[in-house]
């Protein structure tokens, strides 16, 4: 991902589950190591697309995990989207869920918008959503998405297991995603 980003002068997008060390799907230490790696390699544009847990962790624990993540963001990395794993980690071929996640990350079109990940979580809780079901939320600055995943950008999926990564990954790598859900 780094070689590609540097060669083509493109941003790096990290996407995966925001959870604690008890999860079978992701480990925050892996994400923190990636942030450290890209910082040491002087990669200037690093954007995060976070999937909140609430299934393998308590249903309102994303705020704590986000606080821990923020303490490891030291080089201008920005959170671009945040959403529940219900959308981004579906494996039941319920493509409308995947499409919602994809549209938030690629087109900056989320069901919800917020000016920070903290605001997104707070608003989700106010709507009665738990971490697993936080609607795909685009984080904006000056009424524009912080970042979207564009053509030729480098994308790194940091989940440890592949079973819940396949469907969203397919949306990124197979041409004509809109026809996949038919």
Which residue ranges define each predicted feature?
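…; additionally, a secondary subgroup of soluble metalloenzymes is captured
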Residues: 1-182
């Amino acid at each position: 991902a780094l070689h590609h980003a540097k060669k083509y002068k493109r941003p790096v997008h990290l996407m995966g589950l925001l959870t604690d060390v008890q999860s079978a799907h992701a480990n925050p230490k892996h994400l923190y190591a990636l942030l450290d790696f890209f910082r040491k390699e002087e990669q200037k544009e690093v954007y995060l697309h976070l999937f909140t847990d609430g299934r393998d962790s308590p249903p309102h624990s994303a705020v704590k995990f986000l606080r821990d993540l923020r303490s490891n963001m030291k080089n201008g990395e920005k959170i671009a989207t945040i959403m529940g794993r219900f959308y981004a980690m579906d494996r039941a071929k319920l493509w409308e869920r995947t499409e919602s996640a994809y549209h938030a990350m690629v087109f900056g079109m989320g069901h919800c918008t917020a000016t920070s990940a903290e605001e997104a979580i707070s608003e989700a809780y106010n709507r009665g959503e738990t971490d697993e079901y936080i609607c795909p939320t685009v984080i904006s600055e000056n009424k524009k998405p912080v970042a979207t995943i564009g053509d030729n950008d480098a994308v790194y999926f940091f989940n440890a297991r592949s079973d819940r990564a396949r469907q969203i990954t397919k949306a990124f790598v197979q041409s004509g995603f809109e026809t996949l859900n038919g």
